[in-house]
Swiss-Prot record:
A family per Pfam: zf-C2HC_2
Molecular function in Gene Ontology: zinc ion binding
Binding-site list for Zn(2+) 2: 121, 124, 136, 140
Keywords: Metal-binding, Repeat, Zinc, Zinc-finger
Annotated residues for binding of Zn(2+) 1: 18, 21, 33, 37
The protein, known as: Zinc finger C2HC domain-containing protein 1B
Species: Bos taurus (Bovine)
Zinc finger (C2HC/C3H-type): 14-43, 117-146
Residue segments, region Disordered: 190-219
Similarity field: Belongs to the ZC2HC1 family.
Needed co-factor(s): Zn(2+)
Length: 219
C-alpha cells in the first residue's frame, strides 16, 4: 500500500488501489478488503458452464456427460481346443455304438478337458469361472475348517453327551406295591397248601398209582 498512488475523491478523501483487483478504496476499507480479495482470487473456481446457465428456467433437461467405460480385455479364443474336444467326443460316441452292436465292453470315456479360463478351488479341486470362484472358495474354506477331525475332541464330545443323557434320564428301580406283594404271597401259600391230586387214566377214568403214572409218563 506504500507504493500505491493515492487518488483524491470528490470529498477530498484519498483512495488507494487494490493490488489484486485494481479497484480503489479508502485506507481503512482497503485494509479489510485486501485479505478477502486475495483469498477469493487464490481460490480455484469451477469452469463456468454456459450451456447450463442458458438452459436454467426452461423445460429442457440438462444431460451430463456419460462416464467413459473402460475397455474390457478381450479374452483369447481357444477355438482349437474346443475343436479337438468336439472331435474326441464324436469318436468316443462312435466307439461306444460299435461296442454295443458287437457286444463288447464299452471303451473308457475320454479324459475331461480343463478350461484354462477357470480357477481351481484349492480345497475341493473343482474349477469355476471368475464370478463363481470368488463365492465358492470362501464357502469351501469354511466347510473344510469344520471338517477337521480331532480324535481327542470327538471322544470328549461323545463322553459329555453320554453323561448328559444319563443325568437327564436316570434308571428307575422297580418297586412292588403292598397290594401286589400281598397278592403274590397269598398265591404262594395257596399253592403250597393245596393237596396233590392223584393221576387219572384218560381212557378209563380210573385212578392210577404213583409209580405207574411215572412209568407211563416215561414211556
Amino acid at each position: 500500500m506504500a507504493g500505491a498512488q493515492p487518488f483524491l475523491a470528490d470529498g477530498n478523501q484519498e483512495l488507494f488501489p487494490c493490488e489484486v483487483c485494481g479497484r480503489r478504496f479508502a485506507a481503512d476499507v482497503l485494509e479489510r478488503h485486501g485479505p478477502i480479495c486475495r483469498k477469493l482470487f487464490n481460490k480455484k473456481r469451477k469452469p463456468f458452464n454456459s450451456l447450463k446457465q442458458r438452459l436454467r428456467g426452461t423445460d429442457i433437461p440438462t444431460v451430463g456427460k456419460a462416464p467413459q467405460s473402460k475397455p474390457q480385455p478381450v479374452r483369447k479364443s481357444n477355438w482349437r481346443q474346443h475343436h479337438e474336444d468336439f472331435i474326441n467326443a464324436i469318436q468316443s460316441a462312435k466307439q461306444c455304438t460299435l461296442a454295443i452292436k458287437e457286444g463288447r465292453p464299452l471303451p473308457p470315456p475320454p479324459p475331461p478337458t480343463v478350461n484354462p479360463d477357470y480357477i481351481q478351488c484349492p480345497y475341493c479341486k473343482r474349477r469355476f469361472n471368475e464370478t463363481a470362484a470368488s463365492r465358492h472358495i470362501n464357502f469351501c474354506k469354511d466347510q473344510e475348517s469344520r471338517r477337521v477331525f480331532d480324535p481327542a475332541q470327538t471322544a470328549a464330545r461323545l463322553a459329555s453327551r453320554a453323561q448328559g443323557r444319563a443325568q437327564m434320564s436316570p434308571k428307575k428301580e422297580l418297586t412292588v406295591t403292598s397290594a401286589v406283594g400281598a397278592l403274590l404271597q397269598n398265591r404262594a401259600l395257596e399253592a403250597s397248601a393245596a393237596p396233590t391230586r392223584p393221576a387219572v387214566d384218560p381212557a378209563s377214568g380210573a385212578k392210577l398209582r404213583q409209580g405207574f403214572a411215572k412209568s407211563s409218563k416215561k414211556d
